[in-house]
Amino acid sequence: MQGTADLSTSKLGTKKYWDELYALELENFRRNPQDTGDCWFSDSDAEQKMIDFLVDNIGAYRISENASVVDLGTGNGHMLFELHQTEFQGKLVGIDYSEESVKLASNIAEATGVDNFISFQQADIFSGDWKPGKYDIVLDKGTLDAISLSGMKINGKLDVVDVYAGVVERILKKDGIFLITSCNFTQDELVKIIETDNLKMWKTIKYPVFQFGGVQGATICSVAFVKQN
């Protein structure tokens, strides 16, 4: 498994970086309401593929039009806004540890008239004081990637990557689905990081495969897991 020890720390893993980025994006949005900020992995169309995956699998496990959905590391909330435009009309919640992210996403929700359907909360998902409740679907689009670059230790000992699956298990209902997209980890690495006795790989999303130096691979991967108990 590629753990955090194998990844260099980066400013992308710091709260300061994201606070400054989303503060700037909020300022830009206030000047121009059409500018809602960047969409991660847009070059791979990952967000739309994740949404299409959920729509295509309605009826499987806890995936339904009324499913409760939480987006970990929601950023500007773009994925939830897009998801709300589909069949999904259940409780949609975005979580981020950046206060500026929550301000930006909340402002966009209010300006677009969906603040009664989508809510955003600032939280440290690794804190024992966090009381998130449980959801039918948990989403992650690049959040584990950013977290893995932070160099953070839980209780000064455990890498955040090593406890991430426990966070997901904590907030996911039985038969719930965790859908994650990553550019830092391969599909096999994600399975090793996320799979537990209760969380098992279910399906994957296909992306274009490239060949370089005789080796085939994709620049991004998305894996869905189901919580069995």
UniProtKB/Swiss-Prot annotation:
Q: Name one GO molecular function term.
A: protein-lysine N-methyltransferase activity
Cellular localisation: Cytoplasm
Organism encoding this protein:
Saccharomyces cerevisiae (strain ATCC 204508 / S288c) (Baker's yeast)
Miscellaneous section: Present with 1620 molecules/cell in log phase SD medium.
Null mutant: what phenotype?
Answer: Defects at both very early and later stages of endocytic transport in cells.
Q: Which HAMAP family match?
A: Methyltr_EFM4
- What keywords are assigned to this protein? Cytoplasm, Methyltransferase, S-adenosyl-L-methionine, Transferase, Transport
Cellular component (GO) terms are: cytoplasm
What is the protein name stated in its UniProt record?
Protein-lysine N-methyltransferase EFM4
Gene expressing this chain: EFM4
Q: Which reaction does it catalyse?
A: L-lysyl-[protein] + S-adenosyl-L-methionine = N(6)-methyl-L-lysyl-[protein] + S-adenosyl-L-homocysteine + H(+); N(6)-methyl-L-lysyl-[protein] + S-adenosyl-L-methionine = N(6),N(6)-dimethyl-L-lysyl-[protein] + S-adenosyl-L-homocysteine + H(+)
